[in-house]
């Protein structure tokens, strides 16, 4: 008989799906004549649906539509909203450099078209997700205006009960591909001065089209791979090559004292070893005398809807 002991960590308080760079286009065209971006996203959503995962929120970190077309946003909404509703998950949309602020607002958010930065606060119980728009209309690099940084500092002045996740498109980290410097987030130090010493526990980003991790002013940064196509990191040094492979998304588990980011690759694979069902796993854990403590948010509790707060309206030239 084993002595009963608690696992080293309880169940997570929050579970998020982090999806990025869907790059949908209007009609039935292939992205850059090569990739069926709709199909890749559909495959991933079906894979996630079959998994039994039940996230609290799904965070899309930008480049939702390749050309900012209304038809692309309508298509994305048609694919994602039923999926999120079935999972009982809230949707969090982030602007990317390929997106159009006015069209995204109109066709994804049912808001009046506006070219002001799309910054907002999303509260899921005690977890705060801050969406920060790093896009520059007409360009592909990233910038954050002084007015945006002021708004961000004001929001972060009051800590959230369970901390803050910052979601943006351009990651404030180096890229291992030289060409990325032409489209990187500029003046990252200014953002760092605002974030340092706050309750931001993790930064979620996209843009790079490959999965990577780093830290920024001591805060973990997780970049999700794209769902449409990815960058080949084995390309000759200094070069760049997009490829139809290695797509995926990230799973984010938020615990009281840590945030865990895990890559979910698109597609399955042959089973290796013996498949263990959830029921079998529970029995084996119990037989080992181990129990996993529940999270502070009971999984059966019906959580209140996510509360959205937009930043104050600003002039497009602010």
From Swiss-Prot:
Gene3D superfamilies: 3.60.21.10
Stretch list, region C-terminal extension: 278-318
Annotated cofactor note: Binds 1 Fe(3+) ion per subunit. Binds 1 Mn(2+) ion per subunit.
Phenotype for residue 98 to A: 40% decrease in bis(pNPP) hydrolysis. Strong decrease in 3',5'-cAMP and 2',3'-cAMP hydrolysis. Abolishes pNPP hydrolysis. Decreases interaction with the cell wall
Listed GO CC annotations: cell envelope; cytoplasm; extracellular region; peptidoglycan-based cell wall; plasma membrane
Keywords, sorted A to Z: cAMP, Cell membrane, Cell wall, cGMP, Cytoplasm, Hydrolase, Iron, Manganese, Membrane, Metal-binding, Nucleotide-binding, Phosphoprotein, Secreted
Binding-site list for Mn(2+): 63, 97, 169, 207
A UniProt-annotated Pfam family: Metallophos
Domain-related comment: The C-terminal extension (CTE) is used to better adjust the substrates into the active sites and mediates in vivo subcellular localization of the protein. It also modulates expression levels of Rv0805 in mycobacteria.
Family in the record: Belongs to the cyclic nucleotide phosphodiesterase class-III family.
Protein name, UniProt field: cAMP/cGMP dual specificity phosphodiesterase Rv0805
Organism of this sequence: Mycobacterium tuberculosis (strain ATCC 25618 / H37Rv)
Organism phylogeny: Bacteria, Bacillati, Actinomycetota, Actinomycetes, Mycobacteriales
């Amino acid at each position: 008989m084993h002595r009963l002991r608690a696992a080293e960590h309880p169940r997570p308080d929050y579970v998020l799906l982090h999806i990025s760079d869907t790059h949908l286009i209007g009609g039935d065209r292939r992205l850059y004549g090569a990739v069926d971006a709709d199909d890749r996203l559909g495959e991933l959503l079906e894979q996630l649906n079959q998994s039994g995962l039940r996230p609290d929120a799904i965070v899309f970190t930008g480049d939702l539509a390749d050309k900012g077309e209304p038809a692309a946003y309508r298509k994305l909404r048609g694919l994602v909203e039923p999926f999120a509703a079935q999972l009982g998950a809230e949707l969090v949309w982030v602007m990317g450099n390929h997106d159009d602020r006015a069209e995204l607002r109109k066709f994804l958010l049912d808001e009046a078209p506006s070219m002001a930065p799309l910054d907002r606060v999303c509260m899921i119980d005690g977890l705060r997700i801050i969406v920060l728009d790093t896009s520059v209309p007409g360009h592909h690099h990233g910038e954050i205006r002084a007015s945006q940084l002021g708004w961000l500092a004001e929001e972060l002045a009051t800590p959230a009960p369970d901390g803050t996740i910052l979601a943006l498109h351009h990651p404030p980290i180096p890229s291992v591909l030289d060409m990325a410097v032409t489209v990187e987030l500029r003046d990252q130090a200014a953002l760092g001065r605002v974030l340092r010493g706050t309750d931001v526990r993790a930064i979620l980003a996209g843009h790079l089209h490959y999965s990577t991790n780093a830290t920024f002013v001591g805060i973990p940064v997780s970049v999700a791979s794209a769902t449409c196509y990815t960058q080949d990191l084995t390309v000759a040094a200094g070069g760049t090559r997009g490829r139809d492979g290695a797509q995926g998304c990230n799973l984010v588990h938020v615990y009281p004292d840590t945030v865990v980011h895990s890559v979910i690759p698109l597609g399955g694979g042959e089973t290796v070893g013996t498949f263990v069902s959830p029921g079998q796993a529970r029995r084996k854990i119990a037989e080992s005398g181990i129990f996993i403590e529940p999270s502070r948010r009971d999984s059966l509790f019906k959580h209140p809807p996510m509360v959205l707060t937009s930043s104050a309206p600003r002039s497009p030239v602010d």
